Design a protein with these regions (language model features):
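Enzymes that bind and transform nitrogen-containing heteroaromatic metabolites
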Residues: 1-176
Length: 176
């Protein structure tokens, strides 16, 4: 049975913003190591559209960015959206009965399935489907933006904390 994991970069005041958190080389390596073990990823529409940046190679990328793009293209993806009509390679569009689809993925697959996007994570949290939360806490205060938890915070239990690089702390929680 697969485990559903939601993890994102977060400011000290609880906000996520992909433009505010350029990963350090150490954090990028950490993410690459984590990604290699993923079974697949579930994206909300907005996060999927952001990640489509990696569909095409850019000549200015370094070797690590090319590696990430290759991983992105090869990785199975499920995109939850009622407004999209189609998705790119290795992606499946999920428009109806999200709960049944995600429960089916968890039952049929093994390993970890990443959840990307706070709105989708909020919906999956409400359904009791997320098995683990990973908060990558950065020493920055944004003051506004999209919160890590888009709805009421679920009761959680801390299972680990790790320093990644010089200034990012990963907090890992499971539902209490």
């Amino acid at each position: 049975m697969a485990k559903l994991v939601y993890g994102m970069n977060q400011s000290l005041d609880g906000y996520v913003d992909h433009l505010a958190f350029r990963p350090s080389p150490a954090l990028f390596r950490h993410f690459m190591e984590q990604l290699r073990d993923l079974t697949g990823s579930v994206y909300g529409r907005r996060m999927y559209e952001v990640m489509r940046y990696w569909d095409e190679d850019c000549p200015e990328w370094d070797a690590e960015e090319h590696d990430f793009a290759a991983w992105w293209r090869s990785q199975p993806k499920w995109v939850v959206s009622r407004s999209l009509k189609s998705v790119g390679p290795n992606a499946t569009l999920v428009q109806d009965d999200i709960e049944a689809v995600i429960r089916g993925l968890k039952a049929q697959l093994v390993g970890e399935i990443e959840v990307a996007g706070p709105n989708l994570a909020g919906s999956l949290t409400d359904l009791g489907l997320i098995d683990e939360y990973r908060l990558y806490l950065h020493p920055i205060v944004l003051g506004r933006g999209k919160p890590f938890f888009s709805g009421p915070r679920p009761p959680l239990r801390l299972v680990s904390s790790d320093l990644i690089g010089e200034d990012v702390i990963r907090l890992t929680y499971v539902p209490a």
